[in-house]
Amino acid sequence: GVVDILKGAAKDLAGHLATKVMDKL
């Protein structure tokens, strides 16, 4: 459903941001 899509998008975004932060450390 739509909620699942939003949850997936949020997870992908969080993972992407976490990866960016880790690269800077």
Curated annotation (Swiss-Prot):
Keywords, alphabetical: Amidation, Amphibian defense peptide, Immunity, Innate immunity, Secreted
Keyword Secreted: yes
PTM-bearing positions, type Leucine amide: L25
Location in or out of the cell: Secreted
GO cellular component entries: extracellular region
Function: Shows a low activity in stimulating insulin release from rat BRIN-BD11 beta cells, and acts without loss of integrity of the plasma membrane. Does not show antibacterial (E.coli and S.aureus). Does not show hemolytic activity against human erythrocytes.
Listed name of the protein: Ocellatin-L2
Organism: Leptodactylus laticeps
